[in-house]
């Protein structure tokens, strides 16, 4: 039977000094007999997805204490990818994921906490905390800050989000007034950006992994119903912590919940809903921390059998995450997958004995209670605000249309193969990924000529200067985990391609990655990356490249002999090999150099390769 970790610092005469310090934080004699729960917050005024989290930690803490635990809150960092986008700030985004994981490990292990409630929301924060949870392996519940409401303007029939503001800004025909209107309207409230971008994708996946409560991924940040998730998490964590330590119920440990089957469920959900390609990167990293052998090959296998049941922005302008909630949220999607026989429904969760048991209560297409129906009617108010729980608007009805609604049944799927695909070929021996949900059917098979750039900045300049033409495949290399370093997101280049009217006439191929807001024929995570000797570093201007998404292949149309000749010429450059031809005006700090030294390519999750120091 596991022993409460906190007893290390709260019991025994030799811990008098530690107890004295605990007393200085407000603890009493009675508190030393209770579990200590870490409330891991990520409040910051830099990020709209986290700006409202300041009081959430104490909301959870009060419930923990009312349920018989001791709550101790601390904060970790949060980088806003949208604000860091398009400049050297993006070099820090992906490395911050590992820094977040380390910081949570340091705090929780240094102070011997017994369990955690992780309050996350945006792109790297949720995966960073998930990595820490797997690493530490003590009871945990995730509760995120929730999605932003979609924007509205009289200038567009569709709802708006961040990507719309970026695309219109690069449209030379748009007036300054129109750009300003989109800018002011695209992000109206606190919360993670309103489409099925990386942040919302990851928060939805915590439901499929079994580590958060139903509604975590889709209940709006502004809605009063979200308050209940924080309260329930506070109460629930004390219960499962006591079961874990006092009843020897080992199945409450996150590594027991996040099994191989749970990772398959999460990836199955992501493919079905056409989520961000970044989730592949993060799930691989989280699985590695969990000791689960989940790989690109597993993702490729799933992508061939899981249908696409949902198209949400950026894959469609019609729906945003608030619409997914109205259609029954993530458990509605999981329910459709279960009825299709492609969900592991015996997986354990933090709230139910099995996923099947949870579906019987939470899938609105089964027999939902009036309370659950009202829960999924929670909708947007359309009032700009940075305040959580500030409105209680309800949709007049749920969206239960599984033929033409936001969520489809398998019989009415958008496509029989899902919204994410893994491609292999001589340019990506270890694979690359594409959000096929965002690719127009006319270019699922595309042959074009290489337009080679060696940085995101060069690619952006060439696109805006009209040097990129229809039929081009823009290569952006030396932007991988090592080469960037930090594997920058390429939202600006893809947005500008759309702004130039080339969205159905061009492709972009990179060893970097894409924002969850990216759509179009955008292929990322090319592995091995150029800086690690990948063949993407051998491509030259004018080379023909064939992309075949249905057959999961991508190849530069060169003979093996020609590629070998180019590789030999590259290796002959010595210290200059596998580096950009021209020095880039990019300041790489010592911290980023350390990350680059240990970083693996994307097919391994861009995690640190600690075998170098073992």
UniProtKB/Swiss-Prot annotation:
The active site is at residue 515. [2Fe-2S] cluster binds at residues 122, 193. Keywords: 2Fe-2S, Amino-acid biosynthesis, Branched-chain amino acid biosynthesis, Iron, Iron-sulfur, Lyase, Magnesium, Metal-binding. Signal peptide: none annotated. The keyword Methyltransferase does not apply. GO terms for cellular component: cytosol. Its cofactor is [2Fe-2S] cluster; Mg(2+). Its EC number is 4.2.1.9. Binds 1 [2Fe-2S] cluster per subunit. This cluster acts as a Lewis acid cofactor. Pathway: Amino-acid biosynthesis; L-isoleucine biosynthesis; L-isoleucine from 2-oxobutanoate: step 3/4; Amino-acid biosynthesis; L-valine biosynthesis; L-valine from pyruvate: step 3/4. It is an enzyme of class 4 (lyase). The modification N6-carboxylysine is found at residue 124. The keyword DNA repair does not apply. GO terms for molecular function: 2 iron, 2 sulfur cluster binding; dihydroxy-acid dehydratase activity; magnesium ion binding. HAMAP family: IlvD. Homodimer. This is Dihydroxy-acid dehydratase. It comes from Marinomonas sp. (strain MWYL1). The lineage of its organism: Bacteria, Pseudomonadati, Pseudomonadota, Gammaproteobacteria, Oceanospirillales. The gene is ilvD.
């Amino acid at each position: 039977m596991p022993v409460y970790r906190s007893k290390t610092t709260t019991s025994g005469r030799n811990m008098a000094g530690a107890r004295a310090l605990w007393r200085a934080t407000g603890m009493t004699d009675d508190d030393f007999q209770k579990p200590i729960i870490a409330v891991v917050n990520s409040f910051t005024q830099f990020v709209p997805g986290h700006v409202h989290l300041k009081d959430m930690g104490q909301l959870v803490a009060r419930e923990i204490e009312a349920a018989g635990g001791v709550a101790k809150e601390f904060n970790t960092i949060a980088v806003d990818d949208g604000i860091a986008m398009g400049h050297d700030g993006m070099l820090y985004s992906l490395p911050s994921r590992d820094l977040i994981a380390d910081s949570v490990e340091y705090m929780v292990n240094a102070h011997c906490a017994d369990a955690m409630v992780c309050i996350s929301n945006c792109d790297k924060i949720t995966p960073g905390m998930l990595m820490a949870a797997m690493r530490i392996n003590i009871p945990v519940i995730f509760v995120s800050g929730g999605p932003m409401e979609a924007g509205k303007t009289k200038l567009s029939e569709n709802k708006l989000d961040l990507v719309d503001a970026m695309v219109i800004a690069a449209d030379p025909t748009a007036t300054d007034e129109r750009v300003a209107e989109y800018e002011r309207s695209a992000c109206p409230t606190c919360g993670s950006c309103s489409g099925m971008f990386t942040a919302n994708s990851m928060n939805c996946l915590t439901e499929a992994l079994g580590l958060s409560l139903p509604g975590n991924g889709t209940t709006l940040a502004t809605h009063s119903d979200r308050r209940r998730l924080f309260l329930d998490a506070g109460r629930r964590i004390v219960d499962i912590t006591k079961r874990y330590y006092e009843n020897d119920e080992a199945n409450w440990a996150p590594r027991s919940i996040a099994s191989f089957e749970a990772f398959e469920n999460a990836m199955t959900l992501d493919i079905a809903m056409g989520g961000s390609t970044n989730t592949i990167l993060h799930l691989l990293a989280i699985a590695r921390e969990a000791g689960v052998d989940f790989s690109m090959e597993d993702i490729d296998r799933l992508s061939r059998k899981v249908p696409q049941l949902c198209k949400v922005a950026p894959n469609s302008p019609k729906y945003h995450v608030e619409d997914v909630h109205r259609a029954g949220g993530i458990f509605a999607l999981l329910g459709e997958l279960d009825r299709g026989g492609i969900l592991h429904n015996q997986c354990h969760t933090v709230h139910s004995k099995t996923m099947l048991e949870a579906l019987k209560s939470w899938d609105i297409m089964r027999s939902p209670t009036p309370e659950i129906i009202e829960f999924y009617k929670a909708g947007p108010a359309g009032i700009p605000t940075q305040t959580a729980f500030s409105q209680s608007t309800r949709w007049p009805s749920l969206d239960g249309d599984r033929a033409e609604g936001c969520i489809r049944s398998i019989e009415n799927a958008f496509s029989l193969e899902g919204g994410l695909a893994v491609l292999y070929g001589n340019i990506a021996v270890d694979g690359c990924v594409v959000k096929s949900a965002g690719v127009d059917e006319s270019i699922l098979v595309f042959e074009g000529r290489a337009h080679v750039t060696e940085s995101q900045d060069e690619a952006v300049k060439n696109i805006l200067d009209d040097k990129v033409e229809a039929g081009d495949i823009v290569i952006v290399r030396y932007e991988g985990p090592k080469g960037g370093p930090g594997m920058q997101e390429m939202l600006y280049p893809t947005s500008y391609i759309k702004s130039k009217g080339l969205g159905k006439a061009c492709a972009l191929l990179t060893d970097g990655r894409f924002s969850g807001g990216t759509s179009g024929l955008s292929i990322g995570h090319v592995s091995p990356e150029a800086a690690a000797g990948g063949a993407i570093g051998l491509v030259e201007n004018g080379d023909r490249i064939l992309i075949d998404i249905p057959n999961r292949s991508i190849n530069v149309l060169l003979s093996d002999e020609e590629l070998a000749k180019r590789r030999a010429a590259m290796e002959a450059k010595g210290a200059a090999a596998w580096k950009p031809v021209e020095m880039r005006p990019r300041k790489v700090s010592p911290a980023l150099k350390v990350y680059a030294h240990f970083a693996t390519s994307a097919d391994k999750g861009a995690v640190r390769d600690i075998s170098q120091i073992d």
